[in-house]
Design a protein with these regions (language model features):
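Intrinsic-disorder-linked linear interaction elements in eukaryotic regulatory proteins
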Residues: 1-299
Length: 299
């Protein structure tokens, strides 16, 4: 799902009540803060725009209903801004508030709420794998209910979730999302498709990281064959093909390292067993020497 900032200026002035001077003053402050936020954000300055996003959100609380679309959009913008500024923990906290507002405004089965859950998952990805996975899964479930679990929308959001989780080293969790996406792409497009190749590459990379050489070989080979058959000249296809070939070329290296590691473990196990045997033998009590029998008493 492509993310776009939610613009508010087109309806702000029409929706704000300016009946009283105090409200007019707050409205002016709000619009100034939001314009500053939007301008700095468009210039790619999330850190500088952050204070204005927070000011706009705070001022809006006295101008709009707490469960209005405007408050939902402002909360979403602020949470995204925090994430862009590298403040993941604060972003995750704000997204939990955004989820509550979106649920009230749009309902529990809306595409909009799915987007919020997805970004909440992104914010938590490097902080808490369990919370991140839960948010992704909730968003994915909504998309599945709306478009169907065999739809390309469902495949796309699973692919995106898998990529984000794998980037944060949550590889085992990411594998499940990749496999869902792969099944749909293969059924829809076959092997010779960029999306199918992309998922095969990520699954090959996952098993490469876990030194599962034969499984990684299978997925990377599928990705390479699929990409070569496309004869794509675009940057994405070429970059993916180079990366897949690079990993594939290192599989023998990974196998050698893994085999040496396993041999070292075996040697260590043998040494530990030898030491344990020696310790058991040295701790056994020595046999008592023969004791002289007492002579019989004379009668």
């Amino acid at each position: 799902m492509k993310k776009t900032r939610i613009s508010l200026l087109f309806f702000l002035l029409a929706s704000v009540n300016t009946a009283f001077p105090q409200t007019e003053d707050i409205t002016k402050q709000f619009n100034n803060a939001y314009r500053a936020f939007q301008s700095l954000n468009q210039e790619g300055k999330p850190e500088e725009s952050l204070e204005f996003a927070k000011t706009a959100l705070d001022l809006a609380q006295s101008l709009f209903d707490e469960n209005s679309e405007t408050m939902a959009a402002l909360s979403y913008n602020y949470a995204l801004n925090l994430m862009d500024a590298g403040q993941q923990r604060e972003s995750a906290r704000e997204f939990s508030k955004t989820v509550e507002i979106y649920t009230q405004v749009f309902g529990r089965d809306s595409d909009s709420l799915a987007s919020v859950y997805f970004d909440e998952g992104r914010a938590n990805a490097g902080l808490n794998a369990r919370k991140s996975t839960r948010s992704f899964q909730r968003g994915i479930n909504i998309i599945g209910d709306i478009y169907g679990t065999s739809s390309l929308n469902f495949a796309d959001i699973n692919l995106q979730a898998g990529i984000i989780l794998s980037e944060e080293a949550n590889l085992a969790i990411a594998e499940r999302f990749f496999e869902r996406a792969l099944n749909i792409y293969e059924n829809e497009f076959g092997r010779d498709n960029l999306y199918t190749a992309l998922v095969n590459f990520h699954l090959g990379k996952y098993h490469f990281m876990n030194a599962n050489v034969s499984i990684s070989d299978t997925f990377l080979s599928e990705a390479i064959v699929g990409l070569e058959s496309l004869e794509s000249e675009d940057d994405v296809g070429q970059a993916l093909l180079v990366a897949a070939r690079g990993l594939f070329g290192r599989l023998n290296e990974v196998k050698a390292v893994r085999d040496e590691y396993l041999r070292e473990i075996a040697r260590n196990n043998e040494e530990v067993a030898r030491i344990n045997r020696e310790m058991r033998q040295s701790s056994q009590p020595s046999r008592p020497s023969s004791i002289a029998q007492p002579s019989q008493s004379q009668q």
